[in-house]
Amino acid sequence: MKKLSKRMASLSTKIEDRIYAPLEALSIIKENANAKFDETIEAHIRLGIDPKYTDQQLRTTVALPHGTGQSIRIAVITSGENVSKAKSAGADLFGEEDLVESINKGNMEFDLLIATPDMMPKVAKLGRVLGPRGLMPNPKAGTVTNDIGNAIKEFKAGKLEFRADKAGIVHVRFGKASFTKEALFENLKTLQESIDKNKPSGAKGKYWKSFYVTSTMGPSVQVDINAVQDYQAEG
Protein backbone atom coordinates (compact mmCIF):
# COMPACT_ATOMS: atom_id res chain seq x y z
CA MET A 1 0.00 0.00 0.00
CA LYS A 2 1.37 3.40 -1.00
CA LYS A 3 2.30 5.53 2.00
CA LEU A 4 0.90 9.06 2.12
CA SER A 5 3.35 11.94 2.46
CA LYS A 6 3.16 13.92 5.70
CA ARG A 7 1.70 16.85 3.76
CA MET A 8 -1.00 14.74 2.10
CA ALA A 9 -1.81 12.95 5.35
CA SER A 10 -2.21 16.29 7.11
CA LEU A 11 -4.47 17.68 4.39
CA SER A 12 -6.56 14.50 4.29
CA THR A 13 -7.44 14.83 7.98
CA LYS A 14 -9.29 18.06 7.15
CA ILE A 15 -11.71 16.22 4.87
CA GLU A 16 -14.66 14.34 6.31
CA ASP A 17 -15.81 11.04 4.82
CA ARG A 18 -18.98 12.43 3.27
CA ILE A 19 -20.38 13.97 0.11
CA TYR A 20 -19.94 17.74 -0.07
CA ALA A 21 -22.03 20.49 -1.62
CA PRO A 22 -20.24 21.76 -4.77
CA LEU A 23 -19.06 25.18 -3.53
CA GLU A 24 -18.01 23.73 -0.17
CA ALA A 25 -15.98 21.05 -1.94
CA LEU A 26 -14.30 23.62 -4.18
CA SER A 27 -13.49 25.85 -1.20
CA ILE A 28 -11.75 22.94 0.52
CA ILE A 29 -9.83 22.04 -2.63
CA LYS A 30 -8.64 25.65 -3.01
CA GLU A 31 -7.58 25.83 0.65
CA ASN A 32 -5.57 22.63 0.31
CA ALA A 33 -3.91 23.67 -2.96
CA ASN A 34 -0.98 25.31 -1.21
CA ALA A 35 1.94 24.03 -3.27
CA LYS A 36 4.50 26.52 -4.58
CA PHE A 37 2.77 26.66 -7.97
CA ASP A 38 -0.74 27.26 -9.27
CA GLU A 39 -2.18 23.78 -8.95
CA THR A 40 -4.52 22.37 -11.59
CA ILE A 41 -8.04 21.49 -10.41
CA GLU A 42 -9.38 18.22 -11.79
CA ALA A 43 -12.61 16.22 -11.82
CA HIS A 44 -12.64 12.42 -11.69
CA ILE A 45 -16.05 11.01 -12.54
CA ARG A 46 -17.04 7.35 -12.54
CA LEU A 47 -19.90 6.67 -14.94
CA GLY A 48 -22.16 3.64 -15.23
CA ILE A 49 -20.87 2.64 -18.66
CA ASP A 50 -18.73 -0.14 -20.10
CA PRO A 51 -16.63 1.42 -22.89
CA LYS A 52 -15.75 -1.96 -24.40
CA TYR A 53 -19.17 -1.65 -26.06
CA THR A 54 -19.30 1.01 -28.77
CA ASP A 55 -22.72 2.28 -27.66
CA GLN A 56 -21.36 2.93 -24.17
CA GLN A 57 -18.36 5.04 -25.15
CA LEU A 58 -18.07 8.71 -24.27
CA ARG A 59 -15.79 11.04 -26.21
CA THR A 60 -16.65 14.66 -26.81
CA THR A 61 -15.57 18.26 -26.23
CA VAL A 62 -16.63 21.04 -23.92
CA ALA A 63 -15.97 24.78 -24.02
CA LEU A 64 -15.46 25.84 -20.42
CA PRO A 65 -16.69 29.42 -19.78
CA HIS A 66 -13.53 30.31 -17.86
CA GLY A 67 -11.10 28.09 -19.76
CA THR A 68 -8.66 25.75 -18.03
CA GLY A 69 -5.98 28.26 -17.13
CA GLN A 70 -3.49 26.24 -19.15
CA SER A 71 -1.92 27.00 -22.51
CA ILE A 72 -1.81 24.08 -24.92
CA ARG A 73 0.45 23.32 -27.85
CA ILE A 74 -1.53 22.51 -30.99
CA ALA A 75 -0.19 20.63 -34.01
CA VAL A 76 -2.03 20.71 -37.34
CA ILE A 77 -1.58 18.24 -40.19
CA THR A 78 -3.06 19.67 -43.37
CA SER A 79 -2.12 20.50 -46.95
CA GLY A 80 -1.77 23.34 -49.43
CA GLU A 81 -2.78 26.82 -48.35
CA ASN A 82 -4.26 25.42 -45.14
CA VAL A 83 -0.71 25.13 -43.80
CA SER A 84 -0.32 28.91 -43.81
CA LYS A 85 -3.84 29.26 -42.36
CA ALA A 86 -2.83 27.01 -39.47
CA LYS A 87 0.25 29.14 -38.87
CA SER A 88 -1.77 32.37 -38.94
CA ALA A 89 -4.35 30.92 -36.54
CA GLY A 90 -1.69 30.21 -33.93
CA ALA A 91 -0.82 26.54 -34.39
CA ASP A 92 2.45 25.63 -32.66
CA LEU A 93 3.35 22.93 -35.18
CA PHE A 94 1.99 22.62 -38.72
CA GLY A 95 2.80 20.79 -41.90
CA GLU A 96 1.96 18.05 -44.36
CA GLU A 97 3.83 14.76 -44.86
CA ASP A 98 6.85 16.31 -43.15
CA LEU A 99 4.94 16.64 -39.87
CA VAL A 100 3.51 13.13 -40.24
CA GLU A 101 7.04 11.79 -40.58
CA SER A 102 8.27 13.88 -37.66
CA ILE A 103 5.53 12.52 -35.38
CA ASN A 104 6.24 8.99 -36.58
CA LYS A 105 9.83 9.46 -35.44
CA GLY A 106 8.72 10.47 -31.97
CA ASN A 107 8.20 14.24 -32.06
CA MET A 108 5.30 14.55 -29.63
CA GLU A 109 5.81 18.14 -28.51
CA PHE A 110 2.11 19.01 -28.61
CA ASP A 111 -1.00 18.50 -26.50
CA LEU A 112 -3.60 18.36 -29.28
CA LEU A 113 -3.51 17.27 -32.91
CA ILE A 114 -5.90 18.65 -35.52
CA ALA A 115 -6.10 17.30 -39.07
CA THR A 116 -8.09 18.13 -42.18
CA PRO A 117 -10.13 15.22 -43.63
CA ASP A 118 -7.91 14.92 -46.73
CA MET A 119 -4.91 14.09 -44.52
CA MET A 120 -6.58 11.44 -42.37
CA PRO A 121 -5.39 8.47 -44.50
CA LYS A 122 -1.83 9.55 -43.68
CA VAL A 123 -2.64 10.38 -40.06
CA ALA A 124 -4.26 6.95 -39.63
CA LYS A 125 -0.83 5.39 -40.11
CA LEU A 126 0.24 7.11 -36.89
CA GLY A 127 -2.25 5.14 -34.80
CA ARG A 128 0.53 3.21 -33.07
CA VAL A 129 2.06 6.47 -31.87
CA LEU A 130 -1.03 8.61 -31.31
CA GLY A 131 -3.53 6.03 -30.04
CA PRO A 132 -1.96 5.21 -26.66
CA ARG A 133 -1.64 8.92 -25.90
CA GLY A 134 -5.23 9.73 -26.85
CA LEU A 135 -4.07 12.14 -29.56
CA MET A 136 -5.65 10.60 -32.66
CA PRO A 137 -7.85 13.25 -34.36
CA ASN A 138 -11.55 12.45 -34.30
CA PRO A 139 -14.56 14.18 -35.92
CA LYS A 140 -16.62 13.86 -32.71
CA ALA A 141 -13.91 15.71 -30.83
CA GLY A 142 -13.76 18.49 -33.41
CA THR A 143 -10.17 17.64 -34.29
CA VAL A 144 -10.90 16.45 -37.83
CA THR A 145 -12.17 19.54 -39.62
CA ASN A 146 -11.71 21.80 -42.62
CA ASP A 147 -12.30 24.86 -40.43
CA ILE A 148 -8.88 24.69 -38.81
CA GLY A 149 -8.76 28.40 -37.99
CA ASN A 150 -11.86 28.25 -35.82
CA ALA A 151 -10.83 24.93 -34.27
CA ILE A 152 -7.46 26.32 -33.21
CA LYS A 153 -9.12 29.44 -31.79
CA GLU A 154 -11.63 27.42 -29.75
CA PHE A 155 -9.08 24.99 -28.30
CA LYS A 156 -6.67 27.79 -27.47
CA ALA A 157 -9.52 29.58 -25.67
CA GLY A 158 -10.19 26.64 -23.38
CA LYS A 159 -12.27 24.14 -25.31
CA LEU A 160 -11.07 20.67 -24.41
CA GLU A 161 -11.63 17.09 -25.39
CA PHE A 162 -12.43 14.42 -22.84
CA ARG A 163 -13.36 10.77 -22.85
CA ALA A 164 -14.19 7.93 -20.50
CA ASP A 165 -11.28 5.54 -20.00
CA LYS A 166 -11.55 1.74 -20.10
CA ALA A 167 -12.99 1.70 -16.59
CA GLY A 168 -15.67 4.25 -17.46
CA ILE A 169 -13.94 7.07 -15.59
CA VAL A 170 -13.67 10.61 -16.95
CA HIS A 171 -10.61 12.64 -15.91
CA VAL A 172 -10.87 16.35 -16.76
CA ARG A 173 -8.90 19.42 -15.70
CA PHE A 174 -11.30 22.32 -15.30
CA GLY A 175 -9.32 25.19 -13.84
CA LYS A 176 -6.56 26.40 -11.57
CA ALA A 177 -6.35 26.96 -7.82
CA SER A 178 -6.12 30.69 -8.55
CA PHE A 179 -9.65 30.65 -10.01
CA THR A 180 -12.49 31.77 -7.75
CA LYS A 181 -14.69 28.96 -6.44
CA GLU A 182 -17.55 30.50 -8.44
CA ALA A 183 -15.58 30.31 -11.70
CA LEU A 184 -14.57 26.73 -10.93
CA PHE A 185 -18.19 25.84 -10.26
CA GLU A 186 -19.36 27.39 -13.52
CA ASN A 187 -16.77 25.30 -15.36
CA LEU A 188 -17.83 22.21 -13.42
CA LYS A 189 -21.51 22.84 -14.17
CA THR A 190 -20.72 23.17 -17.89
CA LEU A 191 -18.79 19.89 -17.75
CA GLN A 192 -21.70 18.13 -16.02
CA GLU A 193 -24.15 19.37 -18.65
CA SER A 194 -21.87 18.14 -21.43
CA ILE A 195 -21.58 14.68 -19.87
CA ASP A 196 -25.36 14.44 -19.48
CA LYS A 197 -26.02 15.76 -22.98
CA ASN A 198 -23.65 13.21 -24.50
CA LYS A 199 -24.82 10.23 -22.45
CA PRO A 200 -24.07 7.09 -24.50
CA SER A 201 -27.19 5.46 -25.94
CA GLY A 202 -26.23 2.10 -24.44
CA ALA A 203 -25.77 3.36 -20.88
CA LYS A 204 -27.92 1.38 -18.44
CA GLY A 205 -28.82 1.85 -14.80
CA LYS A 206 -27.31 4.62 -12.70
CA TYR A 207 -25.27 6.92 -14.98
CA TRP A 208 -23.36 8.95 -12.38
CA LYS A 209 -21.57 6.60 -9.97
CA SER A 210 -19.24 9.02 -8.19
CA PHE A 211 -17.91 12.54 -8.64
CA TYR A 212 -14.65 13.74 -7.07
CA VAL A 213 -12.63 16.94 -7.40
CA THR A 214 -8.99 17.35 -6.49
CA SER A 215 -5.93 19.50 -7.07
CA THR A 216 -2.54 18.47 -8.43
CA MET A 217 -0.97 17.95 -5.00
CA GLY A 218 -4.04 17.69 -2.79
CA PRO A 219 -6.52 15.06 -1.60
CA SER A 220 -9.84 14.47 -3.36
CA VAL A 221 -13.28 15.54 -2.18
CA GLN A 222 -16.54 13.86 -3.20
CA VAL A 223 -19.13 16.19 -4.72
CA ASP A 224 -22.93 15.94 -4.60
CA ILE A 225 -23.73 15.42 -8.28
CA ASN A 226 -27.44 16.03 -7.68
CA ALA A 227 -26.68 19.51 -6.37
CA VAL A 228 -24.62 20.26 -9.48
CA GLN A 229 -27.35 18.99 -11.80
CA ASP A 230 -30.13 20.82 -9.95
CA TYR A 231 -28.36 24.19 -9.87
CA GLN A 232 -30.04 26.88 -11.96
CA ALA A 233 -28.25 30.18 -12.58
CA GLU A 234 -30.26 33.23 -11.56
CA GLY A 235 -31.69 35.29 -14.38
Curated annotation (Swiss-Prot):
Keywords recorded for this protein, A-Z: Repressor, Ribonucleoprotein, Ribosomal protein, RNA-binding, rRNA-binding, Translation regulation, tRNA-binding
GO BP annotations listed: regulation of translation; translation
Keyword Nucleotide-binding: no
Superkingdom classification of source: Bacteria
An example Gene Ontology CC term for this record: large ribosomal subunit
GO terms, molecular function: rRNA binding; structural constituent of ribosome; tRNA binding
InterPro entries reported in the protein's UniProt record: Ribosom_uL1_bac-type, Ribosomal_uL1, Ribosomal_uL1-like, Ribosomal_uL1/biogenesis, Ribosomal_uL1_3-a/b-sand, Ribosomal_uL1_CS
Pfam families listed in its UniProt record: Ribosomal_L1 (PF00687)
Keyword Ribosomal protein included in the entry's annotation: yes
NCBIfam families reported in the protein's UniProt record: rplA_bact (TIGR01169)
Subunit note: Part of the 50S ribosomal subunit.
Function: Binds directly to 23S rRNA. The L1 stalk is quite mobile in the ribosome, and is involved in E site tRNA release.
Family classification: Belongs to the universal ribosomal protein uL1 family.
Protein name as it appears in the record: Large ribosomal subunit protein uL1
Lineage: Bacteria, Bacillati, Cyanobacteriota, Cyanophyceae, Synechococcales
